[in-house]
């Protein structure tokens, strides 16, 4: 009898965990879709509305750390200028208890990073934290060498 009760409790808790995970995916997908739509609008003022005033936004591959919305706005404006046709596509995302992760694809034409005029596409991931409905911490991870090879700065493998 005790083992049946334990099994029922385990199944119920597992179901609650799956429901919470699915709810997190829906919330994560919604936030990321909106934030990426802002990036895709190429409007830095729109981009920063999805981030807290004290956000720490880190582009790990490029070595850029931006503290606060003003620095993030400057970074976004520079990136949009360098890749004027940038496109971010959410592959998958999940937010749970204020922590999130998203897989994405970034594509565009290099007009200012290395000024080659060549197109690139790279998969990446963001690890982020949410506070008060805004992103308060974001770390982007991707393979910069992939971009460099695609735009001709590094030799193809």
Give residue ranges: language-model regions.
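Bacterial N-terminal signal peptides that target proteins for export
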Residues: 1-6
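Short beta-strand edge/turn micro-motifs at domain boundaries
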Residues: 101, 121-151
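Short, cysteine-centered beta-strand-loop-beta hairpins and adjacent loop/turn segments enriched
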Residues: 81-82, 108-119
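Short, low-complexity N-terminal intrinsically disordered segments enriched in polar/charged residues
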Residues: 11-53, 154-157
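A solvent-exposed, acidic/Ser-Thr-rich amphipathic alpha-helical stretch
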Residues: 29-30, 44-97
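Short beta-strand segments enriched in hydrophobic/aromatic residues
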Residues: 51, 106-108, 126, 142
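A short hydrophobic beta-strand element
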Residues: 97-108
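Hydrophobic pocket/interface hotspot
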Residues: 35, 47-48, 55, 68, ...
């Amino acid at each position: 009898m005790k083992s049946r009760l334990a099994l029922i409790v385990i199944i119920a808790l597992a179901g609650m965990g799956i429901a919470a995970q699915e709810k997190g995916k829906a919330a994560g997908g919604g936030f990321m879709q909106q934030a990426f739509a802002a990036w895709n609008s190429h409007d830095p003022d729109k981009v920063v509305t999805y981030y807290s005033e004290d956000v720490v936004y880190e582009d790990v591959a490029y070595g850029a750390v931006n503290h606060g919305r003003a620095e993030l706005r400057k970074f976004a404006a520079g990136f949009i200028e360098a890749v004027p046709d940038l496109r971010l596509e959410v592959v998958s995302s999940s937010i749970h208890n204020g922590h999130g992760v998203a897989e994405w694809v970034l594509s565009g034409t290099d007009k200012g990073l290395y000024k080659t005029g060549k197109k690139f596409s790279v998969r990446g991931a963001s690890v982020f934290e949410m506070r008060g409905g805004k992103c308060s911490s974001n770390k982007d991870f991707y393979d910069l060498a992939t971009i460099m090879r695609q735009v001709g700065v590094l030799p193809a493998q």
